């Protein structure tokens, strides 16, 4: 293993020891005193099987065959989740064929951030992750199941499902993906039309035509945003079958992979011979693997919030410093839009996850000995599925890229460091997605343009007041202010200004869509403005400096002057479109670096760094 990866992994384990021990005690208690249908009263069990057919009733009450719980995020408005409509019946049929059963344990909400971008509903988006975690726990609380299949893909859905599933870590769990839509209008062309619309050079009809040509069918959006980053991370953590993430919906291979996942879950269920509880798989190694895969592929910054919350649900404490330190030793091996012109289908065709993970394991950057939920270890999961006369088979993944413009080997990386960096300074701590930003754009010092709402920037642009170098400071967009919405609507305007030759950047305590790219954006600023952060004392015209190479984020104002300034007043919270129901979330939520979470308190960090010399003893690997 690479010395730094081992050190960071050990630091996570050490700082998490008390929380992790508590988590394991909770799981051990559920294992020793089975939270299971065998412990239900006759009345309880009768209610649990009342809606089943007579054959399923007979199997379930015998207790010796697996009954699988399905937690589904299906709805037919969300393109990525629409394919799930028929999955429960396919799952039940496949299980019945091997003498097992399944029940839909529950459904969870699934927002589409593409629908809510720039709309009031976006203020519910981050909080929906915690609602999904709670809904997952409610679904599994009936104690009817021997294992779990999760049907979910998109932005907050996967993190929420993982967080909920980890509370039932005594149960084996697998995710079942549905795959990306086929390639439509290129992402680059879509963004070009968006910028033309922002400038008033094309009308709404032309914009809608371009958008609908890009988002055109069932399946995940093809850009490498949060949804596809979720899929990359799930596979890297061993939570779904190898090579299954990016197979298109409504194909024979997709259907075969779903059946294969069903057969695997029956084998590793509590009733099976190869029982493999989720809590035995998900640990500090699996989280480091997920982070490294994210960084090497230039994935979404949203995962820097979600992985922290997911880890906390497993009794582990991950910080942004872990992301930053891993990024410094993880080369960028993939170029997928917005980091390049290729989409996720091109990535799959170039070699996909098996090639990427194989390169990272070979470089000592991923823990190849980490367990995976379907049995075995990650290094044995660098394989890819294919059909041979209609039957699913597996073969070794490609060991050389089939398109070096999309995936490269570690020794010929696109960049020596990963795609996400930590920035620090008198404005606080922040993250920047550097992989999509040109090298000559990664340092900027320019006057601040301060806004408290996305619409303010459009008004300034339309009045011609932004035709200059500037750093847009979007404050009061953090978790406690308004739920930390994504501010993707700002990017077409900033992209236009950049294309006109101006030096522009964004600094915000809010989030950005995983699709955001070429404009440098210091996001997730902590402390946020509504919690007294310095970002709330920045004024129009202040010079703001971003330097990715040195990891600095500062407002160039004397500290005494800053301290003497009155904190800006937060806008009054809005209560329409359901936002009144989430007031308690805004009051309870932790800061962005603690996961923007309402379910767990922010941990008190006491780091005792591990020296490199001890690493080989702890993990049994040679330090290289």
Go through each PLM region and give its residues.
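A short, small-residue-rich loop immediately preceding and capping a beta-strand
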Residues: 139-161, 174-176
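Contiguous domain-boundary segments centered on the initiation and propagation of an alpha-helix
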Residues: 129-136, 143-148, 458-466
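Catalytic or ion-coupling anion/metal-binding cores of large enzyme and transporter domains
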Residues: 1-66, 72-76, 80, 89-108, ...
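N-terminal small/polar loop signature for handling phosphorylated ligands or for N-terminal nucleophile
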Residues: 105-143
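Glycine-rich beta-alpha loop segments
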Residues: 84
């Amino acid at each position: 293993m690479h010395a730094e990866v081992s050190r960071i992994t050990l630091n996570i384990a050490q700082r998490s020891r008390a929380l992790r021990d508590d988590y394991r005690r909770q799981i051990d208690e559920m294992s020793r005193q089975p939270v299971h249908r065998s412990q239900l009263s006759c009345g309880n069990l009768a209610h649990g099987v009342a809606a089943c057919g007579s054959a399923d009733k007979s199997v379930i009450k015998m207790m010796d065959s697996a009954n699988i719980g399905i937690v589904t995020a299906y709805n037919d408005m969300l393109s990525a989740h629409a394919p799930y409509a028929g999955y429960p019946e396919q799952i039940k049929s496949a299980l019945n064929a091997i003498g097992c059963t399944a029940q839909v344990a529950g459904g969870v909400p699934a927002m589409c951030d593409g629908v809510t971008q720039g709309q009031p509903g976006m203020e519910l988006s981050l909080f929906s992750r915690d609602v999904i975690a709670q809904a997952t726990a409610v679904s599994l609380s009936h104690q009817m199941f021997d294992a779990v299949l999760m049907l979910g893909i998109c932005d907050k859905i996967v993190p929420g499902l993982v967080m909920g599933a980890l509370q039932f870590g005594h149960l084996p769990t697998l995710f079942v993906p549905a795959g990306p839509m086929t390639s439509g209008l290129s992402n680059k062309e879509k963004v070009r039309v968006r910028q033309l619309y922002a400038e008033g050079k094309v009308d709404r009809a032309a914009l809608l035509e371009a958008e609908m040509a890009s988002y055109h069918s069932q399946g995940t959006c093809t850009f490498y945003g949060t949804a596809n980053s979720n899929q990359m991370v799930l596979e890297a953590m061993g939570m779904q079958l190898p090579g299954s993430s990016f197979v298109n919906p409504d194909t024979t291979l997709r259907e075969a992979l779903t059946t294969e996942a069903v057969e695997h879950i029956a084998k590793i269920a509590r009733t099976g011979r190869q029982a493999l509880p989720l809590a035995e798989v998900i640990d500090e190694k699996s989280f480091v693997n997920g982070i490294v895969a994210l960084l090497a592929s230039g994935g979404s910054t949203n995962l820097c919030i979600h992985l922290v919350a997911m880890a906390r649900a497993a009794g582990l404490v991950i910080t942004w410093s872990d992301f930053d330190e891993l990024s410094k030793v993880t080369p960028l091996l993939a170029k997928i839009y917005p980091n390049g012109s290729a989409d996720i289908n091109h990535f799959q065709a170039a070699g996909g996850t098996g090639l990427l993970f194989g390169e990272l394991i070979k470089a000592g950057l991923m823990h190849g000995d980490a367990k995976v939920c379907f049995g075995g270890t990650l290094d044995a999961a660098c394989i890819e599925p294919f059909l041979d006369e209609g039957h699913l088979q597996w073969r070794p993944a490609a060991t050389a890229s089939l398109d070096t413009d999309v995936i490269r080997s570690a020794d010929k990386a696109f960049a020596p460091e990963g795609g996400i960096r930590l920035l620090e300074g008198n404005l606080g701590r922040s993250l920047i997605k550097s992989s999509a930003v040109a090298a000559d754009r990664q340092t900027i010092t320019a006057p601040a343009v301060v806004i408290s709402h996305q619409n303010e920037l459009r008004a300034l642009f339309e009045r011609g007041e932004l035709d200059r170098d500037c750093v847009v400071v979007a404050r009061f967009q953090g978790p406690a202010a308004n739920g930390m919405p994504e501010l993707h609507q700002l990017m077409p305007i900033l992209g236009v200004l950049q294309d006109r030759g101006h030096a522009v950047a964004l600094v915000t305590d809010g989030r950005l869509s995983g699709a955001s790219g070429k404009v440098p954006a210091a996001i997730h600023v902590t402390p946020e403005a509504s919690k007294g952060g310095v970002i709330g004392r920045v004024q129009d015209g202040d010079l703001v400096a971003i330097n990715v190479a040195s990891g600095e984020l500062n407002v160039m104002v004397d500290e005494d002057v800053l301290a003497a300034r009155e904190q800006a007043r937060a806008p009054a919270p809005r209560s329409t479109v359901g936002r009144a129901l989430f007031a308690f979330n805004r009051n309870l939520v932790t800061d962005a670096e603690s996961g923007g979470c309402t379910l767990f308190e922010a941990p008190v960090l006491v780091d005792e760094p591990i020296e490199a010399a001890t690493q080989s003893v702890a993990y049994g690997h040679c330090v290289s």
